[in-house]
Curated annotation (Swiss-Prot):
It is a multi-pass membrane protein. One of its GO terms (biological process) is zinc ion transport. PANTHER family: FI23527P1, ZINC TRANSPORTER 63C, ISOFORM F. A motif (Histidine repeat 2) lies at residues 165-169. Contains 3 histidine repeat motifs between the 4th and 5th transmembrane, exposed to the cytoplasm, that may be involved in the binding site of zinc. Pfam families: Cation_efflux. Residues 388-402 have a biased composition (Basic and acidic residues). The modification Phosphoserine is found at residue 225. It comes from Saccharomyces cerevisiae (strain ATCC 204508 / S288c) (Baker's yeast). A motif (Histidine repeat 1) lies at residues 140-144. InterPro entries: Cation_efflux, Cation_efflux_CTD_sf, Cation_efflux_TMD_sf. A motif (Histidine repeat 3) lies at residues 219-223. The keyword 4Fe-4S does not apply. This is Vacuolar zinc transporter COT1.
Length: 439
């Protein structure tokens, strides 16, 4: 475990919070301070969250894929982030209820000076935690642009011919991919799934791989002004570590609120001064909730395998349909394995020979690479008749094919449907409704 790793940071904060929890609960009972006792249980909530985060990091790092968990435990951190977000939301609800009770019947704080001192000590503790996790929360990758003038429109099938590929950084454009992380996709998925993997810092077509490139000739496969750029706003931060950061931030804000209300109660004689404590608590609760809810939504979307928020499935599909030889795309799925690893699977209907598929698949993969998708499963479906140029130019659900046998096309998203023209649907897919009825 190297210094500065996630585990070291979490363990450091865990030890600090445990010590402070003992101090708070002891002094709270000795001084009969309900506020301190309540804050100590708030600290206990953070300790539990840190334990969950530490478990998630260790499991994700040390558990390898096996026959039961074929992707490994990489999503353990996503699960940890969701658990932490739920803890935060539950904590916000409990603070809200307590604050409303204190507004109705505000308690008298007999020793505000002592509460102020404890608040200062707690703020110092949480400031250390903020410094520990600030870098994880704000870390962003650098920009790296990939663009292909003409969107492969000038590619023609020639076997063999030369193929050139130029990468460049473009001023003013931050076109990044989400794979600049310590995760190695080849360690997560078996070689049968991932033939090879290039991260964004690696030239897609390196000299040693040049002989393996698609034999498609091109006149405009270079970076050019006016090319089609796809922006990916990459964030390297881990949702799990972001959840820990929000816990620490919530504690720090809570301690600031305790200090402000204690100081106000200590130094003023207003009859309404005791209302400051619950009112400040409500404001802080709103801030914490506004951060915890998006965290839970992000983690939930990943677990539900939604399309990554930085991508448009329709845009990716439209880009792929411009590749000569592709007629239609269906059963198209894009999802996150983790925050930084995108995966795709799709069926593509083709009007090329099976011998040409490998070369076309490499073009498809390079397209997906530009969008940050570095692992894709392609299911080819070869059309056995000649396809007209009008059909080739159409989209995956073109209306101009209504009188053609291919007009009954399956939907781009979802799975194959009964009666569709998915050429391998009957062989590869079950009719889900019928199967469930049989069982």
């Amino acid at each position: 475990m190297k210094l500065g790793s996630k585990q070291v940071k979490i363990i450091s904060l865990l030890l600090l919070d445990t010590v402070f929890f003992g101090i708070e609960i002891t002094t709270g009972y000795l001084s009969h301070s309900l506020a301190l006792i309540a804050d100590s249980f708030h600290m206990l909530n953070d300790i539990i969250s840190l334990v969950v985060a530490l478990w998630a990091v260790n499991v994700a790092k040390n558990r390898n894929p096996d026959s039961t968990y074929t992707y490994g435990w990489k999503r353990a951190e996503i699960l940890g982030a969701l658990i932490n977000a739920v803890f935060l939301i539950a904590l916000c609800v409990s603070i809200l209820i307590e604050a409303l009770q204190r507004i109705i019947a505000p308690p008298v704080i007999e020793n505000p000076k002592f509460v102020l001192y404890v608040g200062v000590a707690g703020l110092i503790s949480n400031t250390v935690g903020l410094f520990l996790f600030h870098d994880n929360d704000q870390e962003h990758g650098h920009g790296h642009g990939h663009s292909h003038g003409g969107i492969f429109a000038d590619h023609e099938m020639h076997m063999p011919s030369s193929h050139t590929h130029t990468h460049a950084h473009v001023d003013g454009i931050e076109n990044t991919t989400p794979m600049d992380s310590t995760d190695n996709i080849s360690e997560i998925m078996p070689n049968a799934i991932v033939d090879s993997f290039m991260n964004e810092n690696t030239r897609l077509l390196t000299p040693e791989n040049a002989s393996k490139t698609p034999s498609y000739s091109t006149s405009s496969h270079t970076i050019a002004s006016g090319g089609n750029y796809t922006e990916h706003n990459k964030r390297k931060r881990s949702l799990n570590m972001h959840g820990v950061f929000l816990h620490v931030l919530g504690d720090a804000l809570g301690n600031i609120g305790v200090m402000l209300s204690a100081f106000f109660i200590w130094k003023t004689d207003y009859s309404w001064k005791y209302y400051t404590d619950p009112l400040v608590s409500l404001i802080i609760t709103g801030i914490i909730f506004s951060s915890a809810l998006p965290l839970s939504c992000k983690a939930s979307k990943i677990l539900l395998q939604a399309t990554p928020s930085t991508l448009s499935g329709d845009q990716v599909e439209g880009d792929l349909l411009k590749i000569p030889g592709i007629i239609a795309i269906h059963d198209f799925h894009i999802w996150n394995l983790t925050e930084s690893i995108f995966i795709a699977s799709l069926h593509i209907q083709l009007d090329i020979s099976p011998e040409q598929f490998t070369d076309l698949a490499k073009i498809v993969r390079s397209k997906l690479h530009r969008y940050g998708i570095h692992s894709a499963t392609l299911q080819p479906e070869f059309i056995t008749r000649e396809v007209t140029s009008t059909e080739r130019a159409g989209d995956s659900q073109g209306d101009h094919l209504q009188n053609d046998p291919l007009s009954l096309r399956p939907k781009t998203y979802g799975t194959g449907i009964s009666g569709s023209t998915c050429l391998i649907d009957d062989a590869a897919n079950c009719n889900t409704a019928d199967c469930l009825e049989d069982h």
